[in-house]
Amino acid sequence: MAEAERIIGTPDIPEAAGAEPEQADGESGGAGAGTERPKGRRRIAVLFAVAALAYAFDLVSKLIVVAKLEHHAPIEIIGDWLRFEAIRNAGAAFGFGEAFTVIFTVIAAAVIVVIARLARKLYSLPWAIALGLLLGGALGNLTDRIFRSPGVFEGAVVDFIAPKHFAVFNLADSAIVCGGILIVLLSFRGLDPDGTVHKD
């Protein structure tokens, strides 16, 4: 009887032994999934922190310019090479396309939506910084287009940084350009927003 029980019970031993590694694998997989989520949240936090800073600097600078500089003589910062001069720009960044204010407003809103959707898969710190700059800059100029005259979605953006022989721009434009340049560099290096690196 004991011999029969031994023969019958023997096949169960490998299965029982095999079940433990599977359980361990499942536990390690769960631990891996748990470590990825905080990483993603940290990158999203960086994205929105950078966007908030860029937006705040742009908003405060425009409020100061409108209150202190508009309808006044330009202020020379570096001789006539760099001045602060308040103007209203109905076009895109650096004064381009003034006849398409509504179109640029829609584009800015679309960029914000795309960045918000992309944030769910954001695991790369450099991409978080780049997209944060884009988001903050887009929000800054979109705020002007919605709330400033002559009307909703047709408002003129406040520009004030006036280098010699160059278009007048603002801090939101600077954030957008810096974010765009960083995205191009990251793309050339093969770094994706989810943190993976690929080589063509």
From Swiss-Prot:
Pfam families, sorted: Peptidase_A8
Pathway entry: Protein modification; lipoprotein biosynthesis (signal peptide cleavage)
Keywords: Aspartyl protease, Cell membrane, Hydrolase, Membrane, Protease, Transmembrane, Transmembrane helix
Positions of the UniProt region annotated as Disordered: 1-37
PROSITE patterns: SPASE_II
Active site per database record: D159, D173
The protein's Enzyme Commission number: 3.4.23.36
Keyword Nucleotide-binding: no
Ranges annotated as spanning the membrane: 46-66, 96-116, 122-142, 166-186
Location (main, coarse): membrane
Membrane topology qualifier: Multi-pass membrane protein
Family recorded in the similarity comment: Belongs to the peptidase A8 family.
Record HAMAP family: LspA
Name used for this protein in its record: Lipoprotein signal peptidase
Originating organism: Streptomyces avermitilis (strain ATCC 31267 / DSM 46492 / JCM 5070 / NBRC 14893 / NCIMB 12804 / NRRL 8165 / MA-4680)
Lineage, highest ranks first: Bacteria, Bacillati, Actinomycetota, Actinomycetes, Kitasatosporales
Gene: lspA
